[in-house]
């Protein structure tokens, strides 16, 4: 039985969440955390999801209308943060990093990767 007033995440995010359903006040934080984990996972595979692809993940899911834009934004911010953190973590080979960075930033990936590393200190 599904608890009233709770919401599930898209399948791609749900596998990175601590449980299946969330109350409205928990949803944004859960989406940000799951987005970070998804970004990390995608970076390791050198796959980058566009904003449109991430919005598409939510199609057919019931979200509270007053929260939907913030949920999508928090998911995206988490995803971008997780992707960047994976690139600068030191846990990937240089080849993996260059492939993932190019997937994320295109031709200017070297410059943007350098900036990401500088931001991280």
What are these regions (language model features)?
Residues 1-121:
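Intrinsic-disorder/low-complexity detector
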């Amino acid at each position: 039985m599904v608890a009233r007033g709770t919401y599930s995440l898209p399948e791609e995010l749900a596998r990175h969440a601590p449980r299946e359903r969330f109350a409205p006040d928990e949803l944004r934080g859960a989406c940000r955390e799951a987005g970070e984990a998804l970004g990390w996972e995608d970076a390791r595979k050198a796959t980058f999801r566009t904003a449109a692809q991430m919005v598409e993940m939510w199609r057919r899911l019931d979200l509270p209308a007053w929260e939907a834009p913030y949920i999508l934004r928090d998911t995206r911010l988490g995803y971008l943060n997780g992707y960047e953190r994976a690139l600068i973590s030191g846990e990937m080979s240089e080849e993996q990093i260059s492939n993932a960075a190019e997937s994320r930033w295109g031709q200017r990936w070297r410059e943007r990767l350098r900036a990401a590393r500088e931001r991280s200190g």
